[in-house]
Structure formats: structure tokens, C-alpha cells
A protein has these predicted regions:
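Cytosolic ends of transmembrane helices, especially the final helix of ABC transmembrane type-1 domains
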Residues: 228, 252, 269, 299-327
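ABC-type nucleotide-binding domain
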Residues: 329, 336-337, 343-589
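Hydrophobic alpha-helical transmembrane segments of ABC transporter permease domains
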Residues: 25, 36, 69, 75, ...
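An intracellular "coupling" helix at the cytosolic face of ABC transporter transmembrane type-1 domains
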Residues: 119-120, 136-145, 149, 157, ...
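Membrane-integrated ABC transporters
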Residues: 1-45, 60-77, 91-95, 99, ...
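Short intracellular "coupling" helices and adjacent cytoplasmic loop segments at the cytosolic face
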Residues: 2-10, 100, 108-132, 136-138, ...
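Juxtamembrane loop-to-helix connectors within ABC transporter transmembrane domains
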Residues: 15-16, 24, 56, 91, ...
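Transmembrane helices of ABC transporter permease
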Residues: 26, 30-43, 54, 80, ...
Length: 589
């Protein structure tokens, strides 16, 4: 890897760490309490070797064993060990609390921010990758953060405390320990740089794998119908192999951390034992002091092993957190203007003035588009796939902003209207049905949670959904599984229609609204729609021209332009593009 990329990774890692510390800073009192408990835990832990050394000297240094003094020391050791256990338990509890609250804060922030992102981001990123960032990556981050809290505080304090005690016993031998121990730090630092890159690739590839799995599960019927299983398996195998490769390399580097540092620390321990034995023989220290010193040397080197493991886990945590912060840093939809108007008393006057729009800068989709819709008019938009029909709907709802020109409702540019008030004045039934996990009643009342039972049933009857609902096991209390898996496509669309029937806003958008309903049901729904559209401005997008014959005006689109405009009969008489589309559907019959 080039030095430039290394610097970028290092800067990204440091920036991510700083942001994590900002989140942790919200719980500073918990951190302070954890530090105090860590200090108590370390102090008590370091007190035990002193007592052990004194006990050894009581046995070795005198002709007769002082059993009374030895008993007092043993009671002190027992008390210190007991208090250490209690303080360590409290510290771990506080650390767990801080960790999971920080994780909750970041996950909530990521989810809330996700709902503010423009549809362009959602359309451009696989849903599986987004889910992986909010779920899997944050879980990985929490594991590393928890280990950091649990071991980092006590590790640093233990190193400082043991160093002071060793200096008080024998400065020269302490120098041996201090000189040799940094070798393990060098080893851990070298490995940490390698593991961060591998863990980052691992997280990114895990997101790819989640995205592919999510895509396959959501379209299993299509995959099987076209015999695409083998190709899907190849894609899965390729991504899975890359994930295994990154995981193995990350594990390889992380797995050699502890053995390497333990080897160095064992060398330190051996050096202390040899020099300490020589000091005892020469009378520079007692056997009890050597016992204490060996214990301190072990305690001094042990945190380096733990910290090296913590550093490895933190690299994984930082790599995962970086992906989450990338999502959080995505540019949100611009807030409504401070003086944005709330849309009220809507009659349904809509104007599109010289509108230009493109999803990508190099391909203009809508160009010089003009449309004037009077209140209560039913406007049908037809044309071949990709001509811009659904894009017009996206612009009307302000899911996307126009590149140039303007869209007005009641004479006001929709960019000067709050998004919420604009969208609540539209009722929308889309080709892609969406139902939340919950009861049928909850789904119908999605736009009006306060609706009464009578209103919900009336809306279902108007949408011709009441009959099949009553045949369900629990009627309106039947729980719909994920994405309506226990309903047919037609039933799901009828429920979406009932949802709009309940709200009855002044403007309607029907995008391929009856594409998944059988002909008999479609006739009933069309009658219900006709009643619903009376006095309401309605935009109907459909490929099946039989659904738009009664429209007040039909816009025929081609390559982002209106090429024809008029009523059904007028357009047929002209014999133009509309007549060509119509005849292609019905002439064969």
C-alpha cells in the first residue's frame, strides 16, 4: 500500500476515533466513575503482592513462623480480593451501560439520518449494504468498544501502578523491565496497522454479501423462474471467497499479536527472575521482595498483552464505525426553508413550468416540460417504459427537486412549501406495494392512526377489500407477515387502495394502481376510484390504457416530452403515437 493510502487510512482512523469519543463524552460522569473504580481495582490488585511478599518473609526470614502475623496478612489478602471483585463488577456494569448507550445513540442517529436521505441515495445503494451498516457494523463496533472500556482503563493504570511499586523495590531491575517491554508495543503497533485495513475490507465485503442475499430473497420467484440460481451462486461464491480471504488475513495478523507479545513478556519475566535471584544472593533484596517484584513484573507485562488484543479489536471497531459514519455523513435532504408555507385549503391547482430533470447529469430525462392542471381534473400519463412517467410523480411529491423550472400547487412553488404538508395533500397508490408488519387494521389506518373502526371498514368496502379481509383467520386483526408475505399481490394492492380511501386527500397519484388485480376486481376498483376522484385532482400513470379512458386529459410522453395531449377519443382519431400504443394492446383482440 502506498504511503499516501496509509496516511489516508490513519487520518480516517483518527477522525473516526475522535467522533466515537464525542459520543462517549455525553456520558462523562459514567466514565469518571468507571475510572475511579478502575483505580480502586488496580490499587487493591497491586496491594496483594505486597501482602504476599510480607507473608513469604514471615516464613523465610525468621527462625520461627509468625502464624498470628501470617493469619492477619491472609485476612487482608482475602479482604482485598473480595473488594477487588466488587469494584471490578461495578466497573464492568458501568462500562457495559456506557457502551450500549453509545451504540444505541449511534444506531438511532444512523437510522434517523437514513430517513432524511434523498431517494437518489437509496436508489444508488443496495438495501442490504445499508442494513449491514446499521445492524452488523454497529454490532462489530460495540464488541470492540466494550473490550476497550473493560480492559483499557485497568491496563493503563496497572502499568503505571506496577512501575511505581517496582521502582520502590529495586530501580535497577525495574530498568530491565522498562527497556524490554516496549518491544511488545512495537509488535502490537505494527500488527494494528495491518489489521485495520483488513477489517475495513472485511466490513465492506460483508455489506456486499448482505446486499446480494437480501436481493436474492426479495426476488426468489424471479431467480427460480429464469433459472438464475447458478449465476447467483457464482456471485455469492465470489463475494464469499473475498470475505473469507479478508477475514483470514485479518485473523492471521490479529492472531499473532498475543503470541508475539507473550513471547517478549516471557523474556522480560525470565530476565527479572535471573537478576532478582542474583540480587537476593547478594543481599540487595529479600525473598519476599523478589516474590512481590515477580508478581509486579507479570502484572506489568500482562496489560501489554491485553492492550494489544484491545488494539486489534479497536481496529475492527474503527473500521466498522467508519462505515456507519459514512452513512451518517451522507448529505441529507435540504431542510424546508425557514419561511416555508404550510399547504392548506387545497383545491388541486397544479402547474409544471418549463421543468428540466435528470437522475444523472449526462442524461436529460425530462426537458422543457409544461403542464397546467385545473382543480378536479383527472390527468393520465402514458408512454413507453423510461419515458419519464413515474419521474413526474417523483417530482410532484418532491422526492426529487427539479433541475430547472418550477412545480406549483395553488400558485406556490413546492420548494417554498413544507414537504410534510405537500405530501399529506396527496394520496398515493404505487405499483410496488408496501405493507408494514402488523395487523390489517393498522395498515389501512397507516395514514390516519386515529381513524375509527367504522371509517376503516368503510374504506375497505370502497376498495373492495372487506370481503377477503373477513375471510382471513382474524379478520381486521390478522397480522400481516413481513412485506405481506401471506397475501396475494392483488390483495396487497387492495389494502394500499383502502389506505388512500381512508385519507381522501384533495389530490391523488395512482401509479400502475391496478396492474396486479384481476379483471373482475379491477372493474370494481375502477368504480371506487371514479367516486374517489370526483372533485379531486388525480394523476394516473398506467401502461394498461383501459384504465385511463375516462381521464379528462391524457398526456402522451416520449423521451421526456409531451408528444400528444387530449381525451381518449380525440387521440385515437388523430392516429398518432397514442393510437399506435392503444392498437398494439387491443387491435390483436
Amino acid at each position: 500500500m502506498s504511503s499516501k493510502h496509509k496516511d489516508l487510512d490513519k487520518n480516517k482512523s483518527m477522525e473516526t476515533l475522535k467522533r466515537i469519543l464525542d459520543y462517549i463524552g455525553q456520558y462523562r460522569w459514567g466514565v469518571i466513575m468507571s475510572l475511579i473504580l478502575a483505580l480502586i481495582t488496580v490499587a487493591l490488585t497491586l496491594y496483594v503482592p505486597i501482602l504476599t511478599g510480607r507473608a513469604v518473609d514471615r516464613i523465610v526470614g525468621q527462625g520461627n513462623v509468625d502464624f498470628a502475623g501470617l493469619t492477619r496478612i491472609l485476612w487482608k489478602i482475602l479482604g482485598a480480593v473480595g473488594l477487588t471483585a466488587v469494584s471490578q463488577w461495578l466497573m464492568n456494569h458501568i462500562n457495559n451501560t456506557i457502551t450500549y448507550r453509545v451504540v444505541k445513540d449511534i444506531r438511532t442517529r444512523a437510522f434517523n439520518h437514513l430517513e432524511t436521505l434523498p431517494l437518489s441515495y437509496i436508489d444508488a445503494h443496495p438495501s442490504g449494504d445499508i442494513i449491514s451498516r446499521i445492524i452488523a457494523d454497529i454490532d462489530q463496533f460495540s464488541e470492540g468498544l466494550l473490550m476497550g472500556f473493560t480492559q483499557l482503563f485497568t491496563g493503563v493504570l496497572t502499568i503505571g501502578g506496577t512501575l511505581l511499586f517496582m521502582l520502590s523495590i529495586h530501580p535497577a531491575i525495574t530498568l530491565v523491565v522498562v527497556v524490554l517491554t516496549p518491544v511488545s508495543l512495537f509488535v502490537a503497533s505494527f500488527i494494528a496497522k495491518k489489521t485495520f485495513v483488513m477489517f475495513r475490507h472485511q466490513s465492506e465485503t460483508r455489506g456486499e454479501l448482505t446486499a446480494l442475499t437480501d436481493e436474492m430473497l426479495g426476488n426468489m420467484k424471479v431467480v427460480q423462474a429464469f433459472g438464475y440460481q447458478e449465476e447467483t451462486q457464482k456471485q455469492f461464491e465470489e463475494i464469499n471467497s473475498r470475505l473469507a480471504g479478508y477475514s483470514l488475513r485479518a485473523t492471521f495478523f490479529s492472531s499473532i499479536t498475543n503470541p508475539s507479545t507473550r513471547f517478549v513478556n516471557s523474556m522480560v519475566y525470565a530476565a527479572v527472575g535471573i537478576t532478582g535471584a542474583y540480587a537476593v544472593i547478594r543481599g540487595f533484596m529479600t525473598v519476599g521482595q523478589l516474590t512481590s517484584f515477580l508478581s509486579y513484573a507479570n502484572q506489568y507485562t500482562k496489560p501489554f498483552n491485553e492492550i494489544s488484543g484491545v488494539v486489534t479489536e479497536l481496529q475492527n471497531a474503527l473500521a466498522s464505525a467508519a462505515r456507519v459514519f459514512e452513512l451518517i455523513d451522507e448529505k441529507a435532504i435540504l431542510d424546508d426553508k425557514p419561511d416555508a408555507a404550510v399547504l392548506t385549503h387545497v383545491e388541486g391547482k397544479v402547474e409544471l413550468v418549463n421543468v428540466d430533470f435528470s437522475y444523472t447529469p449526462d442524461r436529460k430525462l425530462i426537458e422543457n416540460f409544461d403542464l397546467n392542471v385545473d382543480p378536479g381534473q383527472r390527468v393520465a400519463i402514458v408512454g413507453p417504459t423510461g419515458c419519464g412517467k413515474t419521474t413526474i410523480i417523483n417530482l410532484l411529491m418532491r422526492f426529487y427537486d427539479v433541475d430547472s423550472g418550477s412545480i406549483k400547487v395553488e400558485g406556490t412553488d413546492i420548494r417554498n412549501i413544507t414537504r410534510k404538508s405537500l405530501r399529506t395533500n396527496y394520496g398515493m397508490v404505487l405499483q410496488e406495494t408496501w405493507l408494514k408488519t402488523g395487523t390489517i387494521r393498522e395498515n389501512i389506518a397507516y395514514g390516519r392512526p386515529d381513524a375509527s373502526e367504522e371509517e376503516i371498514i368503510r374504506a375497505a368496502k370502497e376498495a373492495h377489500a372487506h370481503g377477503f379481509i373477513m375471510r382471513m383467520p382474524e379478520g381486521y386483526d390478522t397480522v400481516i407477515s413481513e412485506d405481506g408475505g401471506n397475501l396475494s399481490q392483488g390483495q396487497k394492492q387492495l389494502l394500499c387502495i383502502a389506505r388512500v380511501m381512508l385519507c381522501l386527500p384533495p389530490m391523488l397519484i395512482l401509479d400502475e394502481a391496478t396492474s396486479s388485480i384481476d379483471t373482475r376486481t379491477e372493474i370494481r376498483v375502477q368504480k371506487a376510484f371514479a367516486r374517489m376522484m370526483e372533485g379531486r385532482t388525480s394523476f394516473i400513470v398506467a401502461h394498461r390504457l383501459s384504465t385511463i379512458r375516462e381521464a379528462d386529459v391524457i398526456l402522451v410522453m416520449r423521451d421526456g416530452h409531451i408528444v400528444e395531449k387530449g381525451r381518449h377519443e380525440e387521440l385515437l382519431e388523430r392516429g398518432g403515437f397514442y393510437a399506435e400504443i392503444y392498437n398494439s394492446q387491443f387491435a390483436r383482440g
